[in-house]
Structure formats: C-alpha cells, structure tokens
Amino acid sequence: MLFPIVIGRIYNLEIIFVRHGESEANVLELMYGSSDYLLTSRGKSQAKKAGEILRGMNYEPIAIYVSSLTRTHETLTHMGYAVEEAKKDQRLDERHLGDLEGLDYRVLHKEQPHLFKEWNENWLEYKPGGGETHVAFQMRIRSFLKDLEKNHTKEDRVLVVCHGGTMKTIFAEIFQHHENYFFNLEVYNCSLMRFKQGQKGLVLDALYNIDDWCTGEEESWTSKS
C-alpha cells in the first residue's frame, strides 16, 4: 500500500510537489504532454514566486527530482535551484499524447468530437496513436512513488518539480481513490502540494495556488497581504 493518508501529529519527512510554470503551449491551448515547450514570461514569474514561498517556509530540500522536460528545468531554475543538482526522472514526465501532441484543443474538439467521446468512455485504456494509456502513465508514476518511499528517511525534505497530470495522478495514487481524485483536483501552473509524514502515513498538509499569492502584471507580481 502506498502512503496511507491519516491525521497525525508528528511530522518528519516532507515532500513538496510543484507543477511547472505557464508554458507556451498552455497559452495556445494545445494538446501536449511529452512535447517540449518553453515557459512564458508569466511562467518564469510564477516559478520565481514559488521559490520565494519555499524559502519563506525555510524549506531546504536534501533531494530534488525533476522530469526530463525543459519546462520543469526552467521552472526549477527560476525557483532558484540548480538543475544540475536535481535528479532527472522520465517517470515524472507528463502523459505522452502521441498523434494528438501539438494540436489545438479547441479545433480538435470541434472537428473530431468522437475522439473525446471515445476518450471519456474508456479514459483509463484510451491510447492516442503513438501515445500511452492512462494506465501506463499511472504505472510509471506509481513506480516513482515506490522508489521515493524506499529511498528517503523520515528526516528528509524532498522537492519534486513535474506536471499537472503527474501531480493529479500522484494525488490520486496517495489517496487510493484514483478516478474521483484525478478528475476533481485542479492543478494550476506552479501549484504546490505539500505532504508530511504523520504517525501512520503521509498527510496532505497544504495545497497552494500560486496565483493566490500574486497580483499585478506578469513581470511585477507581489505577495498579497
């Protein structure tokens, strides 16, 4: 059983998961997962603010994990951490959407609604051409979580920078109610999820939406009072 969630009073191991900042593909509303896109200026500002939040918590990770994709590397850099010191793990990559990668979501939904109907009716096993099923995606995330549990002690602080779908799957895996939690959790750009080890398992300690901490234009965000 992975990471049972309980209410506990003694906290030791801490893990913070962060989604990458806004990417070019997010702005264009493209279907993408494994494709590599850069951060926008807004995404860089979001990452900078996420880093400030962690430093405000005096959060000093002894281990950092990051996916293999550029947008997470950029996010980590703008958060103030060295990518070279992070452990790059492809299991954290977003789901591979195969032939759907790079297509305009709005156009696709209008011109080929049957694709979304098929996807919704069999969402776990639906496989875009050349892509992967959600089950395959879920299994590699589960593998990462098992290794994370095995490789870290109760005294460790860990930072993981990854993707929206990855974080939703992690959340659902930890809570062991996959479908309900996957579809009912919104993970915005640079959202932070913090888990702490309680007496019997991991406790969801905090969930931050970075936009709630910022105001103003992309290049001049300030903390809200």
Residue locations for each model-derived region?
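Active-site signature of alpha/beta-hydrolase-fold catalytic machinery across serine-
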Residues: H78, T169, E173
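Phosphate-coordination/substrate-recognition cap region in phosphate-metabolizing enzymes
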Residues: P4, G51-L115
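Short, basic/glycine-rich phosphate-binding loops at helix/coil junctions
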Residues: V27-L30, L115-Y126
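Histidine-centered catalytic micro-motifs
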Residues: V18-G21, V161-T166
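Loop-to-helix element that buttresses phosphate recognition and phosphoryl-transfer chemistry
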Residues: I15, R19-E74, P128-R142
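Generic beta-sheet signal
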Residues: I15, I62, D156-C162
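Acidic, low-complexity terminal tails and accessory targeting/binding regions
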Residues: L2-N12, D89, R95-H109, K150, ...
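GST superfamily/GST-like fold recognition
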Residues: G164-T169, S191
